[in-house]
Every structure is written in structure tokens, then in C-alpha cells.
Amino acid sequence: MEILMKSGDLNKYDLVKNTLVLVLAGGRGSRLHELTDKRAKPALYFGGNRRIIDFALSNCINSGLNRIGVVTQYAAHSLLRHLQTGWSFLPQERGEFVDMLPARQQIDDSTWYRGTADAVYQNMAIIKNHYRPKYILILAGDHIYKQDYSVMLMDHVNSGAKCTIGCIEVPRSEAHEFGVMAVNENLKVKAFVEKPKDPPAMVGKPDVSLTSMGIYVFDADYLYKMLDREVGTPNTSHDFGKDVLPKCLEEGALYAHPFSRSCMGRNTEGEIYWRDVGTLDSFWQSNIDLVSENPQLDIYDQSWPIRGNPVQAYPSKFFYKHSNVHPVDNSLIGGGCVITDASISNSVLFDRIKIDSFSKVDHCVVLPQVKIGKNCVLKNCIIDRECEIPDGMQIGVDMEEDKNRFRISSTGKVILVTPKMLKILEGHEIGEEGHLD
């Protein structure tokens, strides 16, 4: 693949100051089941003290892109609170901001965004009249990765493209979840199909497909034209992958940007890191991966920091009065936790968690404000926020029993536990859960 960007071709400052970023953060993430019943997927916790959307937003700031709009829709309350408290530090007087663009009632009485393209279209008047960008970078707010978007912007301008799509190589067996493309030697897209049942392989790589990352750079005027045209198309699904990108392809305006050119997070073997944590298994695994000695994703890297809004909690404390208890091993522990004579291994614990005597927590992701009683055994679990695990409960030991009590992942490996499930087990009547996430 030919390298498009040449040193000194563009003034990076002029490029980023004329770019508006739109982060699409309105999705539910239905494959995460009860984990996203009360929160949008981008607001889901990740890595001990962050939210998923913090990765896309941190990439923007680290790339010098400080004009950001976050498009919200489904169960947006916790996401909006997170943005207000954790991402309001940019100086408005310098034209820098993280603005929130929630779904709102239109003149034609439509209230919900009908697709990814419609989410941008319904905000087009604001974009044109208020932000007035020359380029628009569109991101999904629910992926885990580190990327310098300014490199992609430079490639976009140098290529002469009207639209550039971020791409990554994935195993062909997984490519049916994404848009799949073929490119020529100059990275011009020659074919594109959204979520094909039988994904085409890359030339010379029969087990690999080139897929869309859901990241697009548009010349602003070209995007306005394409969205005006798309909204009037019969039987449209109002989706970038299904409707807009194929039209860009027909016009010869679509180019690809390989993620390897702008990736800022590589593992010790030099492999690029990008995760779509859209299932219980992938969410659990991506968190558990962080506890290894040399994780694929380095959350401690100060050269490309992942910002957020960590809870201001007291330091965690550990009491071990019995020598036969194996203490904490290979785990991430958030602030404000109290651990008493409990064994914790290969797990990610968020903030304000209490674990009582002689309990064992192994390969678990435990979200904030969970209480785990005495003599409990938890293995391969995702424990949702504010769960209270009663004394002696075992989860992840007898899968047949767990199937009747909790949510089991599609692979049968991971168990999701929520407060509602625990209340049903206790025989309590279930009303509306009203906690602020």
C-alpha cells in the first residue's frame, strides 16, 4: 500500500482547527443484554476507572482535535452526566468544546435518529451555521483503541478524497459484523459491502478481510450533499455503511486509511490494538486482558493518555489477618475498595467495592459499588454496578445452576450478574431501578 502523507504537505494546526469531530454515541449495544438496559454502550465502564467513550474522546484531544460534538440518543442520562463532569475542561473562548447533541423533536414530529446518517443529518443545520467546519470526522463512540486522527486527516487531504474510511484487517470469520472493502494500490476503494454473510478475503490473504472501523473523514460540503440526497432516497435505512458509503463509491470519491498508519497503541509484539467490545465475551475479555504483565493495551502510557472522570474516592485498603488467605494477584483495583481476608486474582475491580472474609474472586470484572459477602466464590463473572452478593453464594462453579439464575454469554464462558437478577433470586418484587449510573 502506498504511503500517502508526505512530511510538510499540510499545516496540521490549520487542518485540525477546521475540523469538527462528531462522536456517534447513541447506540444501545443490544448484544450486551442487561448490561446496557440502563446505559448507552459508550457510557459502559471499562478498565477500572474509565468509560468506553473516553477512548474516542481522548484520541481527539491527543490528536489536537478540540472541536467535538457527541451525538446521543438511547439511555443517555449517565453518558450526559459523564460528559458534563469529565469533559467540560476545554476553553470555549478559544473555540474548543465537547458539545452534546441529543436526539430532539423535529418539525416533522420525528424524535429518534433513524440511523447513523440520520443522526448527522438532523444536526446538519447546527453544523453548517454554528460550527462551520471544512472537514468532518465521524467516529463511533463504543470502540477501544488509540489513534492519531490527524494522520488520517492528512491522508484524506493529500489523497484528494471526498470521503476517507478507516480500515483494519480482521479474521475473515469475524468480518460479517463489519463493512468489508477492497482497495487498489493507491488505497482507493474499489468495492464495499456492509456486513456480508460471506465476507470477501483480501488478495493474497485468504483468511483475512479488510473491514471498516466506523471512522469516516468527509469534506464538509460533500457530506452535506450526500446526506441531502440520502434523506430523499426511497427505502433507505439512513445508515452510513448501507446507504452513504456505497454512493460515495459509485462517484469514485471513497478512499481507505489503514489503521496501522495512525495506531498509537501497540502491544509488545508490535501488533495494533482495536476492540469492538459489543458482546459480553469481548467486554469481559478486553477488561481481563489488562491485568497481564504486558497487556496489549497499555492504559499507563503517558505519551497517549486516556482521560476520563475517575471517582474521587478514598484510597483502597486491604486487611489480611489470616495467613492461609491468598491475597491480591494480577488485578486492577479502583479507589475506595475495602478488601478483608479475600482472594482476588486476574480481575478488574472498579471503585467503592467491598469484599468480605474468605471470598474468592477470579477472572471477574466487578463494576462500582458492589458488595460481596463472606465465603463467596465468583469465577468468570461480570458483576454489574450496585450488586450485593449474599454470603456463601457461588457463581461460575456450576454452569447449569447459573443458567437458571443469571445471563450466560454466547460462548458459555462468562456470567453476567445484575441487581435485578439477585433480587428475583431473593423473591423480591422488582420495580423500576432508579440509581444514577
From Swiss-Prot:
Keywords: ATP-binding, Carbohydrate metabolism, Glycogen biosynthesis, Glycogen metabolism, Nucleotide-binding, Nucleotidyltransferase, Transferase. GO terms for molecular function: ATP binding; glucose-1-phosphate adenylyltransferase activity. It catalyses: alpha-D-glucose 1-phosphate + ATP + H(+) = ADP-alpha-D-glucose + diphosphate. It is an enzyme of class 2 (transferase). Alpha-D-glucose 1-phosphate binds at Y113, G179, E194, K195, S212. GO terms for biological process: glycogen biosynthetic process. Gene3D superfamilies: Hexapeptide repeat proteins (2.160.10.10), Spore Coat Polysaccharide Biosynthesis Protein SpsA, Chain A (3.90.550.10). Involved in the biosynthesis of ADP-glucose, a building block required for the elongation reactions to produce glycogen. Catalyzes the reaction between ATP and alpha-D-glucose 1-phosphate (G1P) to produce pyrophosphate and ADP-Glc. HAMAP family: GlgC. This is Glucose-1-phosphate adenylyltransferase. The lineage of its organism: Bacteria, Pseudomonadati, Pseudomonadota, Gammaproteobacteria, Pasteurellales.
